[in-house]
Design a protein with these regions (language model features):
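N-terminal signal peptide c-region/cleavage motif recognized by signal peptidases
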Residues: 17-19
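Bacterial N-terminal signal peptides that target proteins for export
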Residues: 1-8
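Immediate post-signal-peptide N-terminus of mature secreted/exported proteins
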Residues: 23-59
Length: 172
């Protein structure tokens, strides 16, 4: 089972980071947010069916309908921009693979999966003001953990400085 899950994760990541996708090797922050939003939505959709809680999913979709539609349009644009005519197929494949990975996660531990899904639904509906803040704070769904995000140079420099300071203060 672990081998199957690892293979599925690899397939999902290869859809995202195929060298043929162009010179940009990483997603922008907004593209990464669209990728993660789709992954979280697919995870919640699978959870709704597997855990028999379609009402929670329907409320989630209704609450964030406009944001979800905008994010989905951005996701399609991401794939079309990178892959041209093959973009729509890659978009469909990505969403299918993410849903399949969520289903595999559920198959490994039904009780834990449904408990985590219930907590995720509660968090999503607790503060409906911002889908993006919910998605940012949500745990990364299976298959999403290896997404590479372009970080501006000045942010990278500040991150390196912060890490160096943390290391030096920890070694005292």
């Amino acid at each position: 089972m672990r081998l199957l899950i690892a293979a599925m994760s690899g397939i999902a990541c290869s859809v995202l980071f195929n060298p043929a996708m162009g010179s940009e090797s990483c997603a922008s922050r907004s593209d990464a947010m669209a990728l993660k939003t789709a992954a979280v939505q697919q995870q919640l959709m699978v959870a709704a069916f597997m855990c028999h809680d379609t009402n929670a999913y329907n409320l989630f979709v209704h609450t964030y309908q406009t944001d979800l539609q905008e994010s989905d349009a951005s996701l399609k644009s991401y794939f079309v921009h990178r892959l041209g005519r093959r973009g729509q197929a890659a978009y469909d494949t990505y969403k299918t693979k993410v849903a399949n990975l969520a289903g595999l996660s559920q198959a490994r531990n039904d009780k834990a999966f449904c408990g985590a899904a219930n907590r995720l639904f509660a968090e999503a509906l607790e503060s409906p003001a911002s889908l993006s803040s919910f998605v940012e704070d949500a745990p990364s769904p299976p298959g999403f953990r290896n997404v590479c995000v372009n970080v501006p140079t000045e942010v990278r420099s500040r991150m390196r400085l912060h890490i160096a300071q943390a290391r030096s203060s920890g070694s005292r």
